[in-house]
Protein backbone atom coordinates (compact mmCIF):
# COMPACT_ATOMS: atom_id res chain seq x y z
CA UNK A 1 0.00 0.00 0.00
CA UNK A 2 1.42 3.36 -1.04
CA UNK A 3 1.40 5.91 1.79
CA UNK A 4 -0.81 8.93 1.51
CA UNK A 5 0.74 12.03 -0.03
CA UNK A 6 0.36 14.75 2.57
CA UNK A 7 1.99 17.75 4.14
CA UNK A 8 3.22 15.65 7.01
CA UNK A 9 6.78 14.77 7.81
CA UNK A 10 8.83 12.42 9.93
CA UNK A 11 11.81 14.37 11.27
CA UNK A 12 12.11 16.70 14.24
CA UNK A 13 12.86 19.76 12.18
CA UNK A 14 10.58 19.14 9.19
CA UNK A 15 7.73 21.11 10.67
CA UNK A 16 9.49 24.06 9.02
CA UNK A 17 8.81 22.64 5.57
CA UNK A 18 5.10 22.62 4.78
CA UNK A 19 3.94 22.84 1.19
CA UNK A 20 3.85 26.39 -0.19
CA UNK A 21 0.05 26.58 -0.74
CA UNK A 22 -0.56 25.90 2.94
CA UNK A 23 1.40 29.02 3.87
CA UNK A 24 -0.67 31.39 1.75
CA UNK A 25 -3.21 32.41 4.40
CA UNK A 26 -2.92 35.81 6.13
CA UNK A 27 -2.92 34.46 9.68
CA UNK A 28 -0.37 31.78 8.90
CA UNK A 29 1.78 34.22 6.93
CA UNK A 30 1.99 36.56 9.92
CA UNK A 31 2.89 33.63 12.18
CA UNK A 32 5.63 32.20 9.98
CA UNK A 33 7.11 35.37 8.50
CA UNK A 34 6.87 37.66 11.56
CA UNK A 35 6.52 35.75 14.83
CA UNK A 36 8.78 32.77 14.09
CA UNK A 37 11.81 34.80 12.93
CA UNK A 38 11.56 36.97 16.06
CA UNK A 39 11.08 33.91 18.27
CA UNK A 40 14.00 32.07 16.67
CA UNK A 41 16.19 35.16 17.05
CA UNK A 42 15.54 35.21 20.79
CA UNK A 43 16.14 31.46 21.04
CA UNK A 44 19.35 31.74 19.00
CA UNK A 45 20.87 34.63 20.97
CA UNK A 46 19.97 33.38 24.45
CA UNK A 47 20.78 29.76 23.63
CA UNK A 48 24.14 30.36 21.98
CA UNK A 49 25.32 32.72 24.72
CA UNK A 50 23.93 30.58 27.55
CA UNK A 51 25.29 27.25 26.33
CA UNK A 52 28.68 28.76 25.42
CA UNK A 53 29.09 30.28 28.88
CA UNK A 54 27.95 27.01 30.48
CA UNK A 55 30.52 24.98 28.53
CA UNK A 56 33.36 27.39 29.27
CA UNK A 57 32.45 27.71 32.97
CA UNK A 58 32.37 23.95 33.56
CA UNK A 59 35.32 23.07 31.32
CA UNK A 60 37.72 25.54 32.90
CA UNK A 61 36.39 25.28 36.44
CA UNK A 62 39.09 24.98 39.06
CA UNK A 63 39.21 21.98 41.34
CA UNK A 64 37.37 18.70 41.02
CA UNK A 65 34.53 18.52 38.54
CA UNK A 66 31.39 16.51 39.14
CA UNK A 67 30.86 13.43 37.03
CA UNK A 68 27.51 14.69 35.79
CA UNK A 69 29.21 17.84 34.50
CA UNK A 70 30.67 15.72 31.68
CA UNK A 71 27.13 15.00 30.48
CA UNK A 72 26.07 18.61 30.99
CA UNK A 73 29.00 19.88 28.88
CA UNK A 74 28.13 17.45 26.07
CA UNK A 75 24.46 18.41 26.28
CA UNK A 76 25.39 22.09 26.07
CA UNK A 77 27.63 21.35 23.08
CA UNK A 78 24.78 19.48 21.41
CA UNK A 79 22.40 22.39 21.96
CA UNK A 80 25.04 24.89 20.82
CA UNK A 81 25.65 23.07 17.53
CA UNK A 82 21.91 22.81 16.99
CA UNK A 83 21.41 26.53 17.61
CA UNK A 84 24.11 27.46 15.08
CA UNK A 85 21.76 26.22 12.33
CA UNK A 86 18.79 28.28 13.55
CA UNK A 87 19.66 31.40 11.44
CA UNK A 88 19.18 29.29 8.29
CA UNK A 89 15.65 28.42 9.37
CA UNK A 90 15.03 32.02 10.45
CA UNK A 91 15.83 33.13 6.91
CA UNK A 92 13.56 30.43 5.54
CA UNK A 93 10.60 31.57 7.62
CA UNK A 94 11.24 35.25 6.85
CA UNK A 95 11.29 34.46 3.11
CA UNK A 96 7.93 32.64 3.27
CA UNK A 97 9.39 29.15 3.08
CA UNK A 98 11.99 29.74 0.37
CA UNK A 99 15.39 28.11 0.94
CA UNK A 100 17.99 30.58 -0.32
CA UNK A 101 21.22 29.00 0.99
CA UNK A 102 21.72 26.13 -1.43
CA UNK A 103 21.45 22.35 -1.50
CA UNK A 104 24.52 21.65 0.68
CA UNK A 105 23.19 23.64 3.65
CA UNK A 106 19.72 22.19 3.10
CA UNK A 107 21.05 18.68 3.64
CA UNK A 108 23.83 19.65 6.04
CA UNK A 109 21.75 21.74 8.43
CA UNK A 110 19.02 19.11 8.50
CA UNK A 111 21.60 16.43 9.28
CA UNK A 112 23.17 18.52 12.06
CA UNK A 113 19.78 19.12 13.65
CA UNK A 114 18.86 15.43 13.44
CA UNK A 115 22.17 14.33 14.99
CA UNK A 116 21.98 16.77 17.83
CA UNK A 117 18.33 16.11 18.56
CA UNK A 118 19.10 12.42 19.04
CA UNK A 119 22.19 13.31 21.04
CA UNK A 120 20.25 15.60 23.37
CA UNK A 121 17.61 13.00 24.12
CA UNK A 122 20.18 10.27 24.77
CA UNK A 123 22.31 12.52 26.98
CA UNK A 124 19.29 13.48 29.06
CA UNK A 125 18.60 9.77 29.48
CA UNK A 126 22.20 9.13 30.54
CA UNK A 127 22.01 12.00 33.03
CA UNK A 128 18.83 10.61 34.56
CA UNK A 129 20.37 7.13 34.86
CA UNK A 130 23.52 8.63 36.40
CA UNK A 131 21.46 10.43 39.02
CA UNK A 132 19.46 7.25 39.57
CA UNK A 133 22.63 5.29 40.35
CA UNK A 134 24.10 8.04 42.52
CA UNK A 135 20.99 8.41 44.67
CA UNK A 136 19.26 5.02 44.56
CA UNK A 137 22.33 2.74 44.64
CA UNK A 138 25.25 4.65 46.21
CA UNK A 139 27.38 1.54 46.78
CA UNK A 140 27.01 0.38 43.17
CA UNK A 141 27.56 3.93 41.93
CA UNK A 142 31.00 4.05 43.58
CA UNK A 143 32.10 1.15 41.38
CA UNK A 144 30.43 2.18 38.12
CA UNK A 145 30.55 5.98 38.10
CA UNK A 146 33.98 6.74 36.67
CA UNK A 147 35.13 9.64 34.52
CA UNK A 148 36.45 7.25 31.88
CA UNK A 149 33.05 5.55 31.75
CA UNK A 150 31.26 8.88 31.37
CA UNK A 151 33.54 9.93 28.50
CA UNK A 152 33.03 6.55 26.82
CA UNK A 153 29.24 6.78 27.15
CA UNK A 154 29.24 10.28 25.66
CA UNK A 155 31.38 9.10 22.74
CA UNK A 156 28.98 6.22 22.06
CA UNK A 157 26.02 8.62 22.21
CA UNK A 158 27.60 10.90 19.61
CA UNK A 159 28.45 7.97 17.30
CA UNK A 160 24.93 6.51 17.50
CA UNK A 161 23.41 9.94 16.92
CA UNK A 162 25.57 10.50 13.84
CA UNK A 163 24.49 7.14 12.43
CA UNK A 164 20.80 7.79 13.14
CA UNK A 165 21.07 11.11 11.32
CA UNK A 166 22.35 9.54 8.08
CA UNK A 167 18.87 8.87 6.60
CA UNK A 168 18.34 12.63 6.65
CA UNK A 169 21.08 13.09 4.04
CA UNK A 170 19.16 10.78 1.71
CA UNK A 171 15.66 12.11 2.36
CA UNK A 172 16.24 15.87 2.26
CA UNK A 173 16.68 17.73 -1.03
CA UNK A 174 16.41 21.17 -2.56
CA UNK A 175 13.20 21.12 -4.58
CA UNK A 176 12.09 23.79 -7.07
CA UNK A 177 8.36 24.44 -7.28
CA UNK A 178 7.31 26.99 -9.89
CA UNK A 179 10.92 28.10 -10.05
CA UNK A 180 11.17 28.69 -6.28
CA UNK A 181 13.61 26.69 -4.09
CA UNK A 182 12.33 24.76 -1.07
CA UNK A 183 14.28 22.57 1.36
CA UNK A 184 11.88 19.66 1.63
CA UNK A 185 11.65 15.95 2.10
CA UNK A 186 11.29 13.48 -0.72
CA UNK A 187 7.96 11.77 -1.22
CA UNK A 188 7.46 9.38 1.72
CA UNK A 189 7.42 5.63 1.12
CA UNK A 190 6.07 2.86 3.32
CA UNK A 191 9.62 1.90 4.31
CA UNK A 192 10.49 5.48 5.23
CA UNK A 193 7.32 5.90 7.28
CA UNK A 194 8.04 2.63 9.09
CA UNK A 195 11.58 3.81 9.84
CA UNK A 196 10.21 7.12 11.10
CA UNK A 197 7.78 5.31 13.40
CA UNK A 198 10.45 2.99 14.83
CA UNK A 199 12.94 5.85 15.20
CA UNK A 200 10.40 8.05 16.98
CA UNK A 201 9.50 5.34 19.48
CA UNK A 202 13.08 4.26 20.19
CA UNK A 203 14.67 7.73 20.24
CA UNK A 204 11.97 9.67 22.05
CA UNK A 205 9.19 7.77 23.78
CA UNK A 206 11.41 5.02 25.20
CA UNK A 207 13.99 7.51 26.54
CA UNK A 208 11.17 9.68 27.90
CA UNK A 209 9.70 6.68 29.72
CA UNK A 210 13.10 5.82 31.20
CA UNK A 211 13.69 9.43 32.28
CA UNK A 212 10.31 9.71 33.97
CA UNK A 213 10.76 6.30 35.63
CA UNK A 214 14.21 7.20 36.99
CA UNK A 215 13.07 10.54 38.34
CA UNK A 216 9.91 9.09 39.87
CA UNK A 217 12.02 6.53 41.73
CA UNK A 218 14.44 9.26 42.82
CA UNK A 219 11.63 11.50 44.06
CA UNK A 220 10.03 8.62 45.93
CA UNK A 221 13.33 7.78 47.64
CA UNK A 222 13.99 11.44 48.51
CA UNK A 223 10.51 11.80 49.99
CA UNK A 224 11.00 8.61 52.03
CA UNK A 225 14.33 9.90 53.30
CA UNK A 226 12.79 13.27 54.11
CA UNK A 227 9.97 11.67 56.11
CA UNK A 228 12.37 9.30 57.86
CA UNK A 229 14.78 12.06 58.89
CA UNK A 230 11.97 14.32 60.10
CA UNK A 231 14.06 17.40 59.32
CA UNK A 232 13.49 20.24 56.89
CA UNK A 233 16.49 19.54 54.70
CA UNK A 234 16.71 22.39 52.20
CA UNK A 235 19.13 20.52 49.93
CA UNK A 236 16.78 17.56 49.63
CA UNK A 237 13.80 19.81 48.90
CA UNK A 238 15.81 21.71 46.30
CA UNK A 239 16.92 18.45 44.67
CA UNK A 240 13.30 17.33 44.34
CA UNK A 241 12.44 20.70 42.82
CA UNK A 242 15.28 20.42 40.27
CA UNK A 243 14.10 16.92 39.30
CA UNK A 244 10.51 18.05 38.79
CA UNK A 245 11.53 21.11 36.76
CA UNK A 246 13.93 19.12 34.57
CA UNK A 247 11.27 16.52 33.75
CA UNK A 248 8.62 19.19 33.19
CA UNK A 249 10.85 21.22 30.84
CA UNK A 250 11.76 18.15 28.79
CA UNK A 251 8.14 16.97 28.63
CA UNK A 252 6.61 20.34 27.75
CA UNK A 253 9.22 20.91 25.05
CA UNK A 254 8.96 17.60 23.24
CA UNK A 255 5.75 15.71 24.02
CA UNK A 256 3.27 17.99 22.14
CA UNK A 257 5.22 18.07 18.88
CA UNK A 258 6.17 14.38 18.91
CA UNK A 259 2.61 13.36 19.73
CA UNK A 260 1.36 15.11 16.60
CA UNK A 261 4.34 13.70 14.74
CA UNK A 262 3.32 10.19 15.77
CA UNK A 263 -0.23 10.84 14.57
CA UNK A 264 1.15 12.14 11.26
CA UNK A 265 3.22 9.02 10.67
CA UNK A 266 0.34 6.68 11.54
CA UNK A 267 -1.96 8.69 9.28
CA UNK A 268 0.54 8.37 6.44
CA UNK A 269 0.00 4.59 6.28
CA UNK A 270 -3.67 5.09 5.34
CA UNK A 271 -4.83 5.92 1.77
CA UNK A 272 -6.94 8.86 2.90
CA UNK A 273 -5.19 9.50 6.21
CA UNK A 274 -6.73 8.98 9.64
CA UNK A 275 -6.46 12.66 10.53
CA UNK A 276 -6.85 15.89 8.62
CA UNK A 277 -3.41 16.61 7.20
CA UNK A 278 -3.62 20.41 7.37
CA UNK A 279 -4.83 20.30 10.99
CA UNK A 280 -1.90 18.10 11.98
CA UNK A 281 0.53 20.31 10.05
CA UNK A 282 -0.82 23.39 11.82
CA UNK A 283 -0.48 21.66 15.21
CA UNK A 284 3.13 20.74 14.42
CA UNK A 285 3.86 24.30 13.28
CA UNK A 286 2.56 25.62 16.60
CA UNK A 287 4.22 23.06 18.89
CA UNK A 288 7.47 22.78 16.91
CA UNK A 289 9.05 26.02 18.23
CA UNK A 290 8.79 24.60 21.76
CA UNK A 291 11.30 21.94 20.72
CA UNK A 292 13.63 24.64 19.41
CA UNK A 293 13.23 26.60 22.65
CA UNK A 294 14.32 23.63 24.76
CA UNK A 295 17.91 24.20 23.64
CA UNK A 296 18.08 27.60 25.33
CA UNK A 297 16.22 26.63 28.52
CA UNK A 298 18.72 24.19 30.03
CA UNK A 299 21.42 26.76 30.94
CA UNK A 300 18.79 28.88 32.67
CA UNK A 301 17.49 25.92 34.67
CA UNK A 302 20.99 24.94 35.80
CA UNK A 303 21.92 28.53 36.69
CA UNK A 304 18.78 29.17 38.74
CA UNK A 305 18.47 25.84 40.55
CA UNK A 306 22.03 24.42 40.72
CA UNK A 307 24.21 26.48 43.06
CA UNK A 308 27.35 24.59 41.96
CA UNK A 309 26.88 25.60 38.32
CA UNK A 310 25.80 29.10 39.34
CA UNK A 311 29.07 29.60 41.22
CA UNK A 312 31.05 28.24 38.27
CA UNK A 313 29.33 30.63 35.84
CA UNK A 314 29.75 33.65 38.11
CA UNK A 315 33.44 32.85 38.64
CA UNK A 316 33.89 32.45 34.89
CA UNK A 317 32.29 35.83 34.16
CA UNK A 318 33.83 37.58 37.18
CA UNK A 319 37.13 35.81 37.97
CA UNK A 320 38.13 38.60 40.34
CA UNK A 321 35.45 37.58 42.83
CA UNK A 322 36.65 35.42 45.68
CA UNK A 323 35.30 31.98 46.51
CA UNK A 324 34.00 32.93 49.94
CA UNK A 325 31.55 35.34 48.34
CA UNK A 326 29.52 32.34 47.22
CA UNK A 327 30.03 30.08 50.18
CA UNK A 328 33.05 28.08 51.13
CA UNK A 329 31.45 24.68 50.95
CA UNK A 330 32.58 22.62 47.98
CA UNK A 331 30.27 19.73 48.66
CA UNK A 332 27.83 19.26 45.83
CA UNK A 333 24.20 18.34 46.13
CA UNK A 334 24.91 14.95 44.54
CA UNK A 335 27.63 14.10 47.06
CA UNK A 336 25.47 15.33 49.92
CA UNK A 337 22.54 13.22 48.75
CA UNK A 338 24.74 10.20 48.19
CA UNK A 339 26.10 10.33 51.73
CA UNK A 340 22.72 11.02 53.32
CA UNK A 341 20.87 8.38 51.34
CA UNK A 342 23.66 5.85 51.82
CA UNK A 343 23.18 6.18 55.57
CA UNK A 344 19.42 5.98 55.05
CA UNK A 345 19.70 2.81 52.96
CA UNK A 346 22.08 1.19 55.45
CA UNK A 347 19.63 2.03 58.22
CA UNK A 348 16.80 0.43 56.26
CA UNK A 349 18.89 -2.70 55.67
CA UNK A 350 19.79 -2.86 59.36
CA UNK A 351 16.12 -2.60 60.37
CA UNK A 352 15.13 -5.34 57.90
CA UNK A 353 17.89 -7.66 59.12
CA UNK A 354 16.92 -6.99 62.72
CA UNK A 355 13.26 -7.76 62.03
CA UNK A 356 14.26 -10.93 60.19
CA UNK A 357 16.45 -12.11 63.09
CA UNK A 358 13.68 -11.38 65.59
CA UNK A 359 11.13 -13.32 63.54
CA UNK A 360 13.48 -16.29 63.42
UniProtKB/Swiss-Prot annotation:
SS bonds (residue pairs): none
SUPFAM superfamilies: Family A G protein-coupled receptor-like (SSF81321)
Keyword Transport: no
Single GO BP term: T cell migration
Transmembrane segments: 34-54, 70-90, 121-141, 150-170, 193-213, 240-260, 285-305
UniProt modified residues of type Phosphoserine: 359
InterPro entries, per database record: CCR1-9-like, GPCR_Rhodpsn, GPCR_Rhodpsn_7TM
Extracellular side: 1-33, 91-120, 171-192, 261-284
GO MF term (any one): coreceptor activity
Post-translational modifications reported in the UniProt record: Phosphorylation is necessary for YWHAE binding and efficient surface expression. O-glycosylated. Sialylated O-glycans in the N-terminal tail inhibits binding of GPR15LG.
One GO CC annotation: endosome
Tissue spec: Highly expressed in gut tissues and lymphoid organs, largely restricted to TCRbeta+ cells. Expressed in fetal thymic dendritic epidermal T-cell precursors.
Main location, first listed in the record: membrane
Protein's membrane topology: Multi-pass membrane protein
Protein name: G-protein coupled receptor 15
GN (gene name): Gpr15
Amino acid sequence: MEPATALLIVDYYDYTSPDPPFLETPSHLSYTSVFLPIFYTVVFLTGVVGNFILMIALHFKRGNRRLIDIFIINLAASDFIFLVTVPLWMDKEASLGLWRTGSFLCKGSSYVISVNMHCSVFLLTCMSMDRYLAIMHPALAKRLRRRSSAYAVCAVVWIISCVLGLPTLLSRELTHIEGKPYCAEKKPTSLKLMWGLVALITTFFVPLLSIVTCYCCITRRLCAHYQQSGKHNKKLKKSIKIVIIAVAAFTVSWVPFNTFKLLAIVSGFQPEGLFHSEALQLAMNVTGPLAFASSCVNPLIYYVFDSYIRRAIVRCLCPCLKTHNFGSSTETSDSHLTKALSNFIHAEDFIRRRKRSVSL
